[in-house]
C-alpha cells in the first residue's frame, strides 16, 4: 500500500489496483494551433504540464498502475457531437468555433485529425488503454466503469487538460460511482483564467476528492515495495 500526502488529508491506495488517467492530452488542448488556442484560450504554459505528466506516467507504470489515456472528439461528420437537440451542440467551444470559422470544419477534434492526436511527447505503451470519449466526462458513453470494476480498481489519479472541464467532470462522475479520485495539480491545466484552475482544485479537495502533486506522487510510489506478479 502507498500513502500519498494530499489535500485535505493523506490517502492510502494499492498502486496495482489503481489507475493513472491522462485526460485529453491532445494537440487540441495543449499545442498552439489546436482547438483551444484557436478558440481564444491560452495554451502557452502547457509544456511543463506535459513534462510532469511524462514523469507521473513513468512512475505509475513502474509501480504497476494501469494507464488510461482519453481522447476527446467525434467522427468527421460530427454526428457523435450531437445536433441542435443536444446541449453539447450549443456549449462546445470547438463546435461554436467551427460555426464561426467554417474553414475549420472537420479540423477540430475530428477523429484522425492532427487536432485529435495526442501530443508527440506522450505515447501510450503496450498494456495501456486508450479510450475515445464524446463528452466532457470520461464515464459518459465509454467502457471506463466496466474496465475499472473488472480489474478491482477503486482509486484514480488524474492528470490532463482541462482541469475545470474534462478532468473535474470525470472525477465528479467517478465520485458518484464510488471511486476515490486524486488530482495531481501540476500535471493539469485549466481552460480559461488561472482562477478556473484554483476553483476546480478547491471543488475537488473540498467536495469530491484529493489534490496532490507529481513530485509527492512519485516519492510516495518510490518508497513503496511492490510484490510483482509473475
UniProtKB/Swiss-Prot annotation:
Induction: Up-regulated by the nitrogen regulatory protein C (NtrC also called GlnG) and repressed by RutR. Gene3D superfamilies: Isochorismatase-like. InterPro entries: Isochorismatase-like_dom (IPR000868), Isochorismatase-like_hydrls (IPR050272), Isochorismatase-like_sf (IPR036380), RutB (IPR019916). It is an enzyme of class 3 (hydrolase). Pfam families: Isochorismatase. GO terms for molecular function: hydrolase activity, acting on carbon-nitrogen (but not peptide) bonds, in linear amides. It catalyses: (Z)-3-ureidoacrylate + H2O + H(+) = (Z)-3-aminoacrylate + NH4(+) + CO2; (Z)-3-ureidoacrylate + H2O = (Z)-3-aminoacrylate + carbamate + H(+); (Z)-2-methylureidoacrylate + H2O + H(+) = (Z)-2-methylaminoacrylate + NH4(+) + CO2. It comes from the Bacteria. GO terms for biological process: nitrogen utilization; uracil catabolic process. Keywords: Hydrolase. This is Ureidoacrylate amidohydrolase RutB. It comes from Escherichia coli O150:H5 (strain SE15). The gene is rutB.
